[in-house]
């Protein structure tokens, strides 16, 4: 039983009452975080292997980011991008300094889906084309433009023809023949994640990404890599494309870019940027000085602390530990750096629930069968050991079939008691 079940929270009640209802809320209220640990309102600690869907790769409340935000909040928080700002210029210099060579122009925005919307528009103006190739099992965002690149039907179907699927061809991730057939002289861009996250934590092969680079050049299309979750040290490199020796024409960036503040970007080649007409795209809050200060601090901390190396070393350590678990329920452990998925032979939801409620470990799903771990790169090996031990206990102790059978027996017993009670009531009357 969690603390909130023992002591109902006014904050939980308020959030559930006033929220839009589109989120499936956990029965817990988090109030504080530091490094790889978060605490709920009752003081219970959790090892966080979700970190805001991969945002806090640098850890929660990194002192450099906190200091930068506090100082900037006392100076200037908002300034439109039509008016240059010192922190924005500083951030752009830092960002271009870590980007793959040639990606030296940046459109700043606030979220991953906004970055993908920008990528779509820049691809259209750069090529004069409006068809796209995206990946089955891929996830590119939920706003209407980005949603057209997202494969999962449950995200698209409620909005019908408002989602422009007719201009998008989906190919099987990793299938070279399908990719070659789909990319034509009408294709503006190929959109893909170097590691599919929502699609089950599936790293691409070097051959597939390299062929995507070759064929897009041949056909005059752009290659746009979605590095929203993989970027900024998550996979053991600053960007996942570095594992494959490929430089795209553009990259969508968000999540870990600025230490937890809502910041995103579309980074691109100059020839892509130069073909967008002035005023062809824009944003109100993108590039605001507060987020830019956080971004500068975050990027500098990543380099100084060797965050990519930490993710590479700790990711290999964690995957070795997970692969050592002797459980017939595990089909495969896969990933890159600290982007790790454990595919089970049955649905993952009961195990994810038990990890949170019984073990104090936060993790999440990636497809119904995969448990996804996205710990911060600052997680200690001792904490990794605790997470793996907790997962092994959960695999051993949780039996969804037995629990479901017990629920059914309880329901049948309750129905029987109600029938007996009704019979006694009739006799009494």
UniProtKB/Swiss-Prot annotation:
Residues 411-429 have a biased composition (Low complexity). It is found in: Cytoplasm. Its EC number is 2.6.1.118. HAMAP family: LysJ_aminotrans_3 (MF_02084). It holds the Pfam family Aminotran_3. Pathway: Amino-acid biosynthesis; L-lysine biosynthesis via AAA pathway; L-lysine from L-alpha-aminoadipate (Thermus route): step 4/5. Residues 408-429 are annotated as: Disordered. Belongs to the class-III pyridoxal-phosphate-dependent aminotransferase family. LysJ subfamily. Its cofactor is pyridoxal 5'-phosphate. Its main location: cytoplasm. It comes from the Bacteria. Homodimer. This is [LysW]-aminoadipate semialdehyde transaminase. Keywords: Amino-acid biosynthesis, Aminotransferase, Cytoplasm, Lysine biosynthesis, Pyridoxal phosphate, Transferase. One of its GO terms (biological process) is lysine biosynthetic process via aminoadipic acid. Substrate binds at residues 142, 283. GO terms for molecular function: identical protein binding; pyridoxal phosphate binding; transaminase activity. The keyword Transferase applies. It comes from Deinococcus radiodurans (strain ATCC 13939 / DSM 20539 / JCM 16871 / CCUG 27074 / LMG 4051 / NBRC 15346 / NCIMB 9279 / VKM B-1422 / R1). Binds 1 pyridoxal phosphate per subunit. It catalyses: [amino-group carrier protein]-C-terminal-gamma-(L-lysyl)-L-glutamate + 2-oxoglutarate = [amino-group carrier protein]-C-terminal-N-(1-carboxy-5-oxopentan-1-yl)-L-glutamine + L-glutamate. InterPro entries: Aminotrans_3 (IPR005814), Aminotrans_3_PPA_site (IPR049704), Class-III_PLP-dep_AT (IPR050103), LysJ (IPR037537), PyrdxlP-dep_Trfase (IPR015424), PyrdxlP-dep_Trfase_major (IPR015421), PyrdxlP-dep_Trfase_small (IPR015422). The modification N6-(pyridoxal phosphate)lysine is found at residue 255. GO terms for cellular component: cytoplasm.
